[in-house]
């Protein structure tokens, strides 16, 4: 049994949950403490977190530390999201927090944050696996942005981020002095404008039957976790023009919750109009639940019921399709690459994560040709770095992007391509994976899949690849 504390420094509240994790009984929440403070308000207005807000956070975190000591937790993790991620004084803020609390704060990339939210939903295995059998969208509304993840036949096929989070929208309306009478109309225009391109790109040929709502107070406001489309629209019409005080009394939630709930309702309403959603599921889970699930996963305290790596690969394949990459060429290259990787894994010090990164690089290695045939490598690098590959850290995404880039041009030295995210170890990983991709790509240079069978034989320090074909290679 392990006691684990998860702390989420969000845009409009700081939350700590204490979990009891056992291999037999799974994850059990035993305490939850939440403090309302709007870090995002400072950031989205001024571009940085103020000293007063930082000092208040330090006081709250020190209280959390005392609670953790009282429970004698075995481990803990502190994560910050978009407010800290976008703060211009991020480094100064993190240093001040560490010096005053002793806590090391991990600033999550958007993709890592949303993937953890996704894991929190997947922890409800029975409900989750049943729901995603039909077309499903997860709409994760945060203070700074929203993430929409689409599932088709129980696999994640696309995930996209838009900077229309509830706190950001609220601050925008307040700065423009919008009255409650015109609030919905103007906010709807802003959100619908963002959804217009999204619908054309991702919803054109998809039927979305279910909507899963994450990271918001709507479940607390409606006092249920499942709603039909008509139930939601009735709730929306009843709430949208009420004053904050009146709405708070109606929903039995604090008044300051209403100010961020109202923009969220507009986002959900606009998504319902863009997709033919039948049912809405509000599991009431937060980032802290995902942190506990990931901790249990990494420490092998739980048996996983969902293959998250396959979700990442499915999303990569969908992106490759969008950039008109050759599916048959990818299949041949991926099979060859995995065969080579498995043979040299031990001698090269690879791990399972490296295998996943190689497969993603193989799947996406042709995407740059969509932009430029003469400069495909550089184009592919920028495409991949701009992608929201949910489940990959920025560091891992940069590895994939560089492997694809240097598949077509000579690999430069570490002093030329090194960055703040790229360690020497990452550079060596790029070099090794690039070599594998270069070999397998050359074996199907014609894109005609002439190879019928391939065998890899490792003899001491030499890898021999035997190919069988009825045609000239």
Where in this protein do the model-derived segments appear?
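Helical "lid/coupling" subdomains associated with nucleotide-phosphate turnover
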Residues: 4, 42-66, 70, 83-87, ...
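Post-signal peptide N-terminal segment of secreted/secretory-pathway proteins
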Residues: 74-76
